[in-house]
Curated annotation (Swiss-Prot):
PROSITE patterns: S1. This is Protein tex. Transcription accessory protein. Exact function not known. It comes from Bordetella pertussis (strain Tohama I / ATCC BAA-589 / NCTC 13251). GO terms for molecular function: mRNA binding; structural constituent of ribosome. Keywords: RNA-binding. Residues 746-791 are annotated as: Disordered. Residues 670-739 form the S1 motif domain. Residues 760-769 have a biased composition (Basic and acidic residues). GO terms for biological process: nucleobase-containing compound metabolic process; translation. InterPro entries: HHH_9 (IPR041692), NA-bd_OB-fold (IPR012340), Ribos_protein_bS1-like (IPR050437), RNaseH-like_sf (IPR012337), RuvA_2-like (IPR010994), S1_domain (IPR003029), S1_Tex (IPR044146), Tex-like_central_region (IPR055179).
């Protein structure tokens, strides 16, 4: 496949070969692999389709590499387009030299391109331009050229009253402006200072006067500094939120900033980089040296300081947002791929106090078969009536699982259900606490209204809770991922990039599992490779009118379901118990002829070999490769024949919260509890232990060994055993550890100082994580800033 053909969506004039080579280097692949992947993407193929069904073309690039390629492809194409536009602009100005052309041609980032373009970029009339128009550029050049000159004497030769240059000072000021602008547009100097600031700079934070009380959550940063290069993403976003709320004042600087009498390090760097000579800042400096020193100071203070501070803040935010989005995406993936309970009859209970608990029963297919509202708590306190109602519903519909939302009154509801189960043991029920994050958003959504037009909004939440136990993926795709609540500072990051990343995660998860085309909702179908909202609705409408699809081939009957959509979607759409057993597998219809050859070799019906590993023992995948289907695809076919429609999700398990532990007041240091990981951040993991307030396991308390990334140890939805270290009821803080040998702190019941609240506890760069220590870890004060995470 020619490498230069693989960019049909790129703008004319873009260097295709350069993009392919760059991408190949970045993802560690061959140029031919990248070229094939790019061509497939440009042809409308999706990442899941390419990863699963075009392994020969891409050399087996997985979905992670393809997602990276997809994002970087867009950036590099924009870079090439910008490169072309800059070259054209400078050429039209008649200022493009061979050296400049080479510099632009080898620039690898947008930042470098813009630095090179700065002197030639059309701009408003500046002080330097006014000085040039007054004839002062020769003065500036003369001072630079003559080490022995007296600037004031030279300046007297350049007076120009018509341009308001009436004395030597005015002339020297104009010359200074010209040189300052020239220096500030020197691409190599900018790159040097930028890297120096990033590698040695610090972020300083101090409290805005009078905000000590209002900004209590940010008190760890009232007098704080940390090197830019070591600041973790969550701390950057917390500091920037503090600035946005008017509590913190931030600035970027160097340690030497504090020494007011000495020249700023960047001023010295400017002088050194431009080879302006030694002694510019000495007490006995010559008039020329003193003047050039002032030019360097002016360049820094007036032209560069504010711009670089803004740029560095932007760089900090960009890197922090990228990491926060990565964490959110990883957590979302874990949540979507959580273990499904499967086709079981489930009673969903959405706890409430004053307005009552909403109840919905769904059958094994997810269909709502009954609803009720019960009032076991204040003000009615009809506990007995509630128990009888729940038991009657469970008996009538042969309920197997009870899903209890983890919001308000969750533990009280769980205890109520436990009492009901103890009174009616023959019902053989299992209770499970389920995250209800996003359930209220779904209840009031257009999707829910279309799905349940006759069902009260408040009851839809109970249905969602029940269904997300039955099949988390199928239910959670109906909710905006941002409403599910597994991100850090999700409202503070670039919303467009967040949406793009989360959409990619949802698409990858849905296609990794596969979708039953005869039972899936339109919301789930819309996430299948090659489909969209319109096609998904058309599939559901056709299904409602004509009944279940007997074969994948019948999908072609759906309006607007063309060959391209069929190619991209068919392998991910499953038809259990259909006319063709292969339609229930991940074998793509285009590869059915390969299966026919396998069946012919074995001399058996396909129904007799599916799921029968023994039947395939006498044949090898290599015997069935051809020009179209290589060994990777044929191996995948064999794997599907051995275990068709395999589900990548784990086995369903439930956590059991400890009886009698329902509020923060029930917790004491030293308690060992079972809980469920609800969120993973860079500084640790939040765990639901059944007290309405998630506890925090700091990264240093996740394991006996050093942990770099919490996700190496825990995942959202994972059941874990933890020990309570500290409890601070007043501030609703619980410090936990998964190192069960850690010593618990003495009980603190409300003085506001416990559970990792100590000043500066989050300054991870200054307090290295213990490697194998047995002491209680310094728990992160970031729990404050992340309190909103659970909303």
């Amino acid at each position: 496949m020619p490498e230069t053909s693989a960019t049909t969506n790129a703008a004319p004039g873009v260097d295709h070969a350069r993009i392919i080579a760059q991408l190949a280097t970045e993802i560690g692949a061959r140029a031919s692999q990248v070229a094939s992947a790019v061509e497939l993407l440009d042809d409308g193929a999706t990442v899941p389709f390419i990863a699963r069904y075009r392994k020969e073309a891409t050399g087996g690039l997985d979905d992670g590499a393809l997602r990276t390629l997809e994002v970087r492809l867009g950036y590099l194409r924009e870079l090439e387009e910008r490169r072309g536009a800059i070259l054209e602009s400078i050429t039209q100005q008649g200022k493009l030299t061979p050296e400049l052309q080479q510099e632009i041609a080898t620039a690898e980032t947008k930042q470098r391109l813009e630095d090179l373009y700065a002197p030639y970029k059309p701009k408003r009339r500046t002080r330097a331009q006014i000085a040039r128009e007054a004839g002062l550029e020769p003065l500036a050049d003369a001072i630079l050229a003559d080490p022995a000159c007296d600037p004031a004497a030279l300046a007297a030769q350049y007076l120009n009253p018509e341009a308001s240059i009436n004395d030597a000072k005015a002339a020297l000021d104009g010359a200074r402006d010209i040189l300052a602008e020239r220096h500030a547009e020197n691409a190599d100097l900018l790159a040097d200072i930028r890297e120096h600031l990033w590698s040695t700079g610090l972020l300083y934070s101090k409290m805005v006067e009078g905000k000590e009380t209002d900004g209590a959550n940010f008190r760890d940063w009232f007098d704080f500094n940390e090197p830019l290069r070591t600041l973790p993403s969550h701390r950057i976003l917390a500091l920037m939120r503090g600035r946005q709320q008017g509590v913190l004042e931030l600035r970027v600087g160097l340690e030497a900033d504090l020494e007011a009498e000495t020249p700023h390090p960047c001023v010295v760097r400017i002088a050194s980089f431009l080879k302006l000579g030694n002694g510019l800042f000495a007490l006995d400096a010559t008039p020329r040296a003193r003047w050039l020193g002032e030019v360097c100071r002016w360049t820094w203070r007036v032209k560069l300081l504010t711009a670089f501070e803004s740029e560095l803040f932007g760089r900090l935010r960009e890197s922090a947002e990228a990491e926060a989005i990565r964490v959110f995406a990883a957590n979302l993936k874990d949540l979507l791929l959580a273990a499904p309970a499967g086709p079981k009859t489930v009673l969903g209970l959405d706890p409430g106090i004053r307005t009552g608990c909403k109840v919905a029963v769904i059958d094994r297919t997810g269909k709502v078969v009954d609803t009720a509202t019960v009032y076991p708590f204040e003000p009615r306190r009809d506990r007995e009536g509630t128990i009888k109602t729940l038991a009657a519903l469970a008996a009538r519909h042969k309920v197997e699982l009870i899903a209890i939302g983890n919001g308000t009154a969750s533990r009280e509801s769980e205890k109520l259900v436990g009492d009901m189960m103890a009174r009616f043991p023959d019902l053989a029920l299992t209770r499970v606490v389920v995250s209800e994050a996003g359930a209220s958003v779904y209840s009031a959504s257009e999707t829910a209204a279309l799905e349940f037009p006759d069902l009260d909004v408040t009851l839809r939440g109970a249905v969602s809770i029940a269904r997300r136990l039955q099949d988390p993926l199928a239910e959670l795709v109906k909710i905006d991922p941002k409403a599910i609540g597994v991100g850090q500072y999700q409202h503070d990051v670039n919303q467009r990039e967040l949406a793009r990343s989360l959409d990619a995660v949802v698409e990858d998860c849905v296609n990794a599992v596969g979708v039953d085309v005869n039972t899936a909702s339109a919301a789930l179908l819309a996430r299948v490779s090659g489909l969209n909202t319109l096609l998904a609705k058309n599939i559901v409408a056709w299904r409602d009118e004509n009944g279940a699809f007997p074969t994948r081939d019948m999908l072609r009957k759906v309006p607007r379901f063309g060959e391209k959509a069929f190619e991209q979607a068919a392998g991910f759409l499953r038809i259990p118990n259909g006319d063709n057993p292969l339609d229930a597998s991940a074998v793509h219809p285009e590869a059915y002829p390969v299966v026919e050859r396998i069946v012919a070799r074995i001399k058996a019906d396909v129904r007799h070999i599916i799921g029968q590993r023994e039947a395939l023992k006498g044949v090898s995948p290599s015997d069935f490769t051809d020009e179209r289907f290589g060994l990777p695809t044929v191996r995948d076919i064999f794997a599907e024949l051995e275990k068709p429609g395999r589900d990548p999700r784990p086995e369903f398990k439930t956590a059991q919260f400890k009886e009698g532990v329902e509020t923060l007041n029930d917790l004491f240091p030293g308690m060992v509890l079972e809980g469920v990981v609800t969120n993973v951040a860079n500084f640790g993991a939040f765990v639901d232990i059944g007290v309405h307030q998630d506890g925090l396991v700091h990264i240093s308390a996740l394991a006996e060994k050093f942990v770099k990334d919490p996700r190496d140890v825990v995942r959202v939805g994972q059941t874990v055993t933890v020990k309570v270290l500290e409890v601070d009821v007043a501030r609703k803080r619980v410090a936990l550890t998964m190192r069960l040998n850690d010593a618990a702190e003495p009980a603190r019941r409300g003085n506001g100082a416990g559970a990792g609240a100590a000043r500066g506890a989050d300054r991870g760069a200054r307090r290295p994580q213990a490697d194998n220590g047995k002491g209680a870890p310094a728990n992160s004060a970031m729990a404050d800033a992340f309190a909103k995470l659970k909303r």
